[in-house]
Amino acid sequence: MQSIDTLTESLNGKRVLVVEDEALIAMLAEELLGELGCVIHAVASNIPKALALVEAGGFDLALLDVNVARERVFPVAEALAARNIPFVFASGYGEQGLRDDFKSRPLVGKPYSGDHLEKALLAALAQ
């Protein structure tokens, strides 16, 4: 079994797309991801921008708020899944806010802590 330090090393340098419409939560995500050794690829505050960033690529995984600017993030999740890019959902509503076909994907509750975010990201990379 790998140590926590070894697992965390697997996040070092990973480029993350953050899809979050609330500025303070996006800033918290950026801070926590940085502490985990990740690099922020971009922050998208709406679905069209997120889809354009997914199309352009250049990142290793994504953190997706389930509700972005009054829209569901599922088109972005579908685009990521089609490209085999790992992702984590973030929601204050728990699993009940997810579509059935995405309930097997890692979910981190909001507000999230560094520990919970780290575990969810590692789970996404392992899928």
Tell me what each language-model feature is.
Residues E20:
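Conserved acidic carboxylate
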Residues D65:
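Active-site residues of response regulator receiver
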Residues K110:
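A Lys-centered signature of the CheY-like receiver
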Residues V43-L61:
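Acidic, metal-coordinating helix/loop segments flanking the phosphotransfer/catalytic sites
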Residues M1-R15, R99, S113-Q127:
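Non-catalytic signal-transmission and effector/linker regions of two-component phosphorelay proteins
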Residues A23-A42:
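Two-component/phosphorelay signaling modules centered on CheY-like receiver
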Residues E71-I85:
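Short amphipathic alpha-helix used as the core "switch/output" element in two-component signaling
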